[in-house]
Every structure is written in structure tokens, then in C-alpha cells.
Regions:
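Low-complexity, flexible helical/coil segments
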Residues: 59, 71-79, 96-100
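Short N-terminal helix-initiation segments at or just after the protein's N-terminus
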Residues: 1-11, 62-73
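Short acidic, gly/pro-rich beta-turn/loop elements at beta-sheet edges
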Residues: 46-48, 71-73, 130
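Small/polar-rich, solvent-exposed N-terminal microdomains that initiate assembly or binding
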Residues: 1-51, 87-97
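Oligomerization/assembly interface segments of phage tail-like spikes and tubes
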Residues: 53-71, 116-128
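Acidic-leaning, charged glycine-interspersed low-complexity segments
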Residues: 82-130
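Mid-chain, well-packed structural core segment of small domains
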Residues: 67-89
């Protein structure tokens, strides 16, 4: 399995997992609140030697929860965390543990001059062997 195939599989599984927990994943038009955006990085392959033909790939997964109010953002953040906590996505023939590595509490985001939104950011890490 190639790294790009794994990336596509992880991204699709992430969106499906969130949708199954009734979390609206942002589409091209951000016209309704609340929603979450997801960013899955290109995998990093460390130079470690595993002693066989396998390679370890590590993905960074970032989520940004967006709501019109702080309460809306907090409620959606709880659903996102519930969906991803202890989730073990399948890659290849095995499932792998997703780790929650960082979280920023909801905060008012004043970067958008035409609207008032609250955002919360979380970082997750997923390492797989292929």
C-alpha cells in the first residue's frame, strides 16, 4: 500500500466517523453552523529500521470546530472528541490507535470581519505500519 493510498483511506475514514456521530464536516461552502474542518497531513516516514519490509507512517490530524456561539462550539467539540476518542481506524488489515496530542479551548475568532465565530482546535496523531 502506498502512502498516498493510506492518506486517502485515513481521510475518508475520519469523515465517515464524524458523520456517524452526527458531526457536520465542512463542505466547500461554510454556510451553516456548527461544523468541523479536518486536516490530515501528508505522512511522515521516520528513518527507523523495523528489520523487515514494513514502514511506519505518522499522520497529523487537526480538527477545527466552529460555532456561532461559545456554547455551540463546546457542544460540537464534545461530539468530535467523543467520535475520535478511542477510535481505531483500520488501515490495511489492522486497526491503529489514534492519539489525542493537543487541545485548545474554544475561543472567539476575530479573523473574520463579516461574522462572529468561536473555534476550538485539536491535534491528533496516527501511526501505522504498511
Amino acid at each position: 500500500m502506498k502512502a498516498g493510498e493510506v492518506l486517502a483511506q485515513v481521510a475518508a475514514a475520519l469523515d465517515a466517523r464524524l458523520a456517524a456521530h452526527k458531526v457536520r464536516v465542512a463542505a466547500a461552502a461554510f454556510d451553516a453552523y456548527p461544523y468541523v474542518t479536518t486536516y490530515v497531513s501528508s505522512p511522515v516516514a521516520p528513518t527507523e529500521d523495523l528489520g523487515d519490509s514494513r514502514r511506519r507512517l505518522t499522520f497529523s490530524i487537526n480538527t477545527v470546530t466552529v460555532g456561532e456561539t461559545e456554547a455551540q462550539c463546546v457542544a460540537l467539540l464534545a461530539r468530535v472528541t467523543d467520535a475520535l476518542h478511542r477510535w481505531r481506524p483500520e488501515v490495511g488489515e489492522r486497526s491503529w490507535r489514534l492519539e489525542h496530542v493537543a487541545a485548545m479551548p474554544p475561543a472567539y475568532d476575530d479573523d473574520l470581519p463579516d461574522r462572529r465565530v468561536w473555534t476550538a482546535r485539536d491535534a491528533w496523531s496516527l501511526s501505522v505500519l504498511i
